[in-house]
């Protein structure tokens, strides 16, 4: 028995710059009852730091005028022709469905981003065609599912073929007494993530509250936002296991995205570590941390005001941290079971 998981081309299934999809698969496959039957197909240049042994790095060598994506899929199909799969799970690339469907019709399609922004699911016709072809479509959040359903027949709203299975993480063992006066920002240091607004707010806050520090983890080579303060530490990119340690000891985590986050891995991780989480009310972010403070209108003043409230009111901060932590339910165990439930049904059918 074989289950094939195909990643988007360039999804880095490695501890170096691992994306949210890679982290999710690593954690849930380890807990799957089918873990010995699963093969992951992808492409990365970081071959020394692969996250799992059952990974196949597909060749992308091409000739002139060939699409790298087409070469990538063709190489996957070569593997499939040699040893066919009982089930194929396609992640975040609806345009892969057409070619894979020709040789295997037991397909599951995952959406980790807004379907309306992805090649192969932008139009109503494309989305209707996907519903006809694949056995199941999995969405990272209700928000991404609702985006997919725009213009689709209302009968599909409660159709079991379309299911929300969120990302997950381990609920960390923490001590609230060991939390430190740290304001944490994790993510790409760009305007989409609201880093420019965070930077402007944080320098003012650190002047007002000199016994607090701010830590920034992440990078962004395409944008350059420079903020300096003696209590502001910018660490650059760090591996996931290192980032988790900072979440565990930080009092406050800020996820102030401008764009509609499909879900919000950072908010999820912060919640699992009992941070007082501040998010923008955008996209699927509220689903990642339902009890977080939500900012409806993002600007430096509003962000600064909400962080200040947590800093000044210690009782409010502690209650918020415990409420977020105690109500955290999106564990890897829960999500791995949900995934295995549909696998069992589709393999038997």
Predicted regions mapped to residue ranges:
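Conserved donor-binding/catalytic core segment of Leloir-type glycosyltransferases
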Residues: 4, 138, 175-193, 199-202
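N-terminal strand-loop element at the rim of the active site
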Residues: 7-15, 24-67, 96, 158
């Amino acid at each position: 028995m074989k289950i094939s998981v195909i990643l988007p081309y360039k999804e880095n299934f490695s501890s170096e710059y691992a994306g949210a999809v890679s982290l999710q698969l690593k954690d849930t496959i380890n807990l799957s009852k089918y873990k010995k039957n699963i093969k992951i197909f992808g492409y990365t240049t970081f071959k020394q730091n692969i996250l799992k042994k059952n990974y196949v790095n597909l060749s992308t060598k091409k000739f002139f005028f060939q699409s790298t994506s087409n070469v990538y899929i063709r190489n996957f199909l070569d593997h499939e022709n040699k040893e066919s799969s009982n089930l194929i799970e396609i992640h975040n690339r609806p345009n892969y469905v057409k070619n894979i469907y020709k040789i295997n019709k037991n397909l599951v399609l995952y959406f980790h981003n807004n379907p309306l922004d992805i090649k192969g699911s932008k139009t109503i016709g494309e989305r209707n065609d996907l519903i006809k072809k694949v056995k199941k479509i999995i969405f990272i959040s209700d928000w991404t599912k609702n985006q997919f359903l725009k213009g689709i027949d209302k009968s599909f709203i409660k159709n079991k073929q379309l299911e929300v299975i969120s990302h997950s993480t381990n609920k960390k063992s923490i001590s609230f007494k060991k939390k430190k006066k740290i304001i944490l920002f994790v993510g790409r240091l760009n305007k989409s993530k609201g880093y420019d607004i965070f930077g402007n707010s944080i320098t003012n806050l650190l002047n007002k509250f000199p016994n607090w520090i701010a830590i920034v983890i992440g990078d962004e080579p395409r944008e350059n936002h420079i903020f300096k303060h003696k209590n502001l530490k910018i660490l650059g990119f760090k591996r996931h296991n290192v980032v988790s340690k900072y979440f565990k000891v930080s009092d406050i985590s800020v996820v102030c995205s401008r764009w509609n986050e499909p879900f919000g891995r950072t908010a999820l991780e912060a919640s699992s570590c009992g941070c007082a989480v501040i998010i923008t009310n955008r996209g699927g972010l509220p689903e990642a941390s339902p009890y977080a403070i939500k900012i409806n209108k993002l600007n430096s003043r509003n962000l600064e005001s909400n962080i200040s409230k947590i800093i000044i009111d210690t009782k409010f901060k502690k209650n918020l941290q415990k409420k977020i932590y105690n109500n955290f339910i999106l564990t890897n165990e829960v999500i791995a079971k949900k995934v295995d439930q549909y696998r069992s049904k589709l393999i038997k059918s």
